Amino acid sequence: MPITDFIINDEKTPLVLHGGPEQWKTVGPYGCFRVGICLLLVELCERFTFFEVVCNMIPFCTGRLGSYNHQAAMLNLGFIGTSVLTPVFMGWLADEYFGRNKLMYIALSLHFLGTALLSMLAFPAENFYRGAYPVFNNTSVEEQAGLFHVALLTLCLGTGGIRAVVCPPDMCGSQERESKKPMPFCNWASWSANLNAAVVFLGISSIQPLGSGALGILLPSLSVFTALVTLYLKHCDLIYRPENRCSLLTIARAFVRALKTRCLPYCHFGRDGSSWLDHAMEKQGGHHSELQEEDTRNISALLPLFSFQILYRTCLLQIPSGYYLQTMNSNRNWGGFSLPIALMNAISLLPLLILPPFMDYFSNCLLPSKRDGPFLSACMIAGNICAASSVAMAGFLEIYRKLAREQSPSGKLFSVSSMACVCLVPQYVLLGVSEVLVNPAVSMVTHRVIPGASMAFLTLSHGSACFAGAMLIKLLYLISEGNWFPNTLDKGNLENFFFVLASLMLLNILGLWRASWRYCNLNHFNAQRIRGNRCEETLLLTEKSLKFYGSTQGASSSIDLWETAL
């Protein structure tokens, strides 16, 4: 969490801390600075542990566990998706069952247990337990794989608990929801998170050449340091408690009830002209507040956008799967120095650090009147084009990589290509540029429609994209009988996988272009938002949005099937 999330004035500033909304504490500028530093350290250590596992997942699974490339890539995407979604689940457990204090201790214990088990498995023990202490030397590969999966699940639960209790997503967006200013195109909280990730990847790149022993000691040490800083925050009663509004699970539960009640009898309209969602929530009256029901109705209107987002993020997640395999099988020697794989991730973050300030200036100063209109749709379409270009470029470079294979004097071909991995930099940069364009535009659209649950629904789209990417890899592997995602890249056609993904992205772009007019007209949500009672405010905004999403209007109300097929 950046320090700028806390407003520091000359006077003492009230902060909602661990005690809840009813208990306020007065924290001065020094207290705000102390909280910011502690949260920054917690997030830095937690991110370092997470990305360290992601960067070494595929080499470990293919080298030590004997997994195929597609299995390692699917496991990596599954780990990322689970880590993205567990904060929602752990936050729900904290609010409904365990309480935030008890869950914090459980999460810290699980995080340490996961890192310790990963260190003992991944960095074996031949260097430390040779001879008298053969801890994992005598275990079979199947048992090691089972323990590895248990360690990953334990680490995911611990990471989710830390993010939910210590660094909740609501902390970044609480001040933006209360601010009367329109949401800026450049979210400085996201920019600071990207800077944090870049620092983490550079740190991993500098540590990887030291060998597995250093990494085996570092992971549990970071977990212990995270626990100490978190306990210090708990001791000083400085842990932020977000306001209890519409959570993702509450909205999903209401939407599922609505689907069960009226989805089959009423596809789009009821007998009296009102929407099937209105009938469903009327029948389920008393279960949810009016505010939650209005958010559910708005979420149903945004479903086409999030279907496009899932495929886009599936393309974006090629960095920890297909792109990693390309980098591993390319020549990483540069000037006598072996470039770590994590360095390519840091390169993909450069556009996310350089371009957002210029984009914010361009949208605010040069096009202030059109910033909330077609500009957002143009950014989303341009970002998807950049992502499709990146995947297509990866396919062509894979063809060139296989042609540039070296051979020994005896004529034996090496598995690693002579193509320098620096040639892969443009495809990483294009994915970074696409994220600069797409993520702020989608965030602004969802913030105007569902300001209370936009962060949670974006999290759901990101996590769903991880599992969708894993399913796509498995599906194409089965269809091609292993040829399009081969275990040995030189004996298969990985470029076909990239070309198929690029073709799907082109269909995604066409569908987004067809449906973009629905989201060009959402700019009035932020400008005409009425202060006061949240339920009355939501009813007014929904009344204005009905003419675009067609609960009661017959013209241009139905969503084309081919727009949502993806």
Swiss-Prot record:
Topology in membrane: Multi-pass membrane protein
GO biological process terms held by the UniProt record: peptide transport; protein transport
Classification via InterPro entries: MFS_trans_sf (IPR036259), POT_fam (IPR000109)
One Gene Ontology MF term: symporter activity
GO cellular component, one term: membrane
Keyword Transport carried by entry: yes
Main location (coarse class): membrane
Transmembrane segments: 73-93, 103-123, 146-166, 184-204, 213-233, 299-319, 339-359, 379-399, 413-433, 453-473, 493-513
Localization in the cell: Membrane
Family stated for the protein in its record: Belongs to the major facilitator superfamily. Proton-dependent oligopeptide transporter (POT/PTR) (TC 2.A.17) family.
Purpose: Proton oligopeptide cotransporter.
PANTHER family, per the entry: OLIGOPEPTIDE TRANSPORTER-RELATED
Protein name in the entry: Solute carrier family 15 member 5
Organism: Mus musculus (Mouse)
